[in-house]
Amino acid sequence: ADVPGNYPLDKDGNTYKCFLLGENEECLNVCKLHGVQYGYCYASKCWCEYLEDDKDSV
């Protein structure tokens, strides 16, 4: 089964762009900022595993 998750949003409500697909240190840091431990770059946007619908932009 696919792991649930979401695209985190910044304070302006935008997704975080990324260029290095897969394991991506920038995305890991973004995901930790949003309170989850792991994420990666997918389709040029940071994706965070187990992130709820991201209503609280940071």
From Swiss-Prot:
SUPFAM superfamilies cross-referenced by the UniProt entry: Scorpion toxin-like
GO MF terms, alphabetically ordered: sodium channel inhibitor activity; toxin activity
InterPro entries membership: LCN-type_CS_alpha_beta_dom, Scorpion_toxin-like_sf, Scorpion_toxinL/defensin
Cystine crosslinks: C18-C41, C27-C46, C31-C48
Domain LCN-type CS-alpha/beta: residue ranges: 3-58
GO CC annotations, alphabetized: extracellular region
Keywords of the record: Disulfide bond, Ion channel impairing toxin, Neurotoxin, Secreted, Toxin, Voltage-gated sodium channel impairing toxin
Main location: secreted
A Pfam short name: Toxin_3
Tissue expression: Expressed by the venom gland.
Subcellular location: Secreted
Domain of life the protein comes from: Eukaryota
UniProt cross-references to Gene3D superfamilies, sorted A to Z: Knottin, scorpion toxin-like (3.30.30.10)
Coiled coil location: none
CDD domains: neurotoxins_LC_scorpion
Function: Beta toxins bind voltage-independently at site-4 of sodium channels (Nav) and shift the voltage of activation toward more negative potentials thereby affecting sodium channel activation and promoting spontaneous and repetitive firing. Does not produce effect when administered to blowfly and cabbage looper larvae. In mice, does not produce convulsions, tremors, increased ventilation nor death.
Domain notes: Has the structural arrangement of an alpha-helix connected to antiparallel beta-sheets by disulfide bonds (CS-alpha/beta).
Similarity-based family: Belongs to the long (3 C-C) scorpion toxin superfamily. Sodium channel inhibitor family. Beta subfamily.
Protein name as catalogued: Ikitoxin
